[in-house]
Amino acid sequence: MRHYEIVLLIHPDQSEQVPAMLERYKGMITAGGGKVHREEDWGRRQLAYMINKLAKAHYLCLNIEADQAVMAELEHAFKFNDAVLRHLTVQKKKADTAPSSMMKTVEREEARKASQTEQA
């Protein structure tokens, strides 16, 4: 089995369905004999450029271990899900379980917002 990192950009109006979508994709991975090593919800973030006249998207990152049949099934599911604006799959040499630099940035922003609300 190979290790992959998947980043999904979800339509911002579908943010409520993100947990259900994530569970469905994780179910597909585990049903095919794969493992989810890391899942990160980066939240709604500004896009670098407009996609389908949208300036923001909900970001998800998954680090998984799966075979090629499961990956083909996932790619097929991403393509035919209208809520998925873009997806990127990168093959990795080993499983990443530590928080990504993007997740550290998200946590830092949340801590800053929390301290601002406490001061107010």
Swiss-Prot record:
Region (Disordered): 93-120
InterPro entries xref list: Ribosomal_bS6, Ribosomal_bS6_CS, Ribosomal_bS6_sf, Ribosomal_S6_plastid/chlpt, Transl_elong_EF1B/ribsomal_bS6
Keywords: Ribonucleoprotein, Ribosomal protein, RNA-binding, rRNA-binding
Keyword rRNA-binding attributed: yes
Cited HAMAP family: Ribosomal_bS6
PANTHER family: MITOCHONDRIAL 28S RIBOSOMAL PROTEIN S6, SMALL RIBOSOMAL SUBUNIT PROTEIN BS6M
Name under which the protein is recorded: Small ribosomal subunit protein bS6
Source organism of the structure: Delftia acidovorans (strain DSM 14801 / SPH-1)
